[in-house]
Amino acid sequence: MKVYCLLVVLLVGLVSQTQGQLDKKCNMACTLDYRPVCGSDGKTYPNRCALTSTACESQQSITVLHDGEC
């Protein structure tokens, strides 16, 4: 039982640390400049930074299809 509890504590710590690293990596300071781009997910983003930030946070591969709205 002690071993099980120890494994649970270690697993929770590992998940928390991994999420913290992801949050730091994706924490981008994007400007409010409106230079729309069309993402490969079919959504219009206000600028390239916003697209990159969304892709990082959602852990998806979203690329710029073209400048301008979709």
Curated annotation (Swiss-Prot):
Gene Ontology MF, one: ion channel regulator activity
Record GO biological process: cell differentiation
Keywords: Disulfide bond, Ion channel impairing toxin, Neurotoxin, Protease inhibitor, Secreted, Serine protease inhibitor, Signal, Toxin
Signal peptide: 1-20
Main localization of the protein described in the UniProt heading: secreted
Record family assignment: Belongs to the conopeptide P-like superfamily.
The name this protein goes by in its record: Turripeptide Pal9.2
UniProt organism field: Polystira albida (White giant-turris)
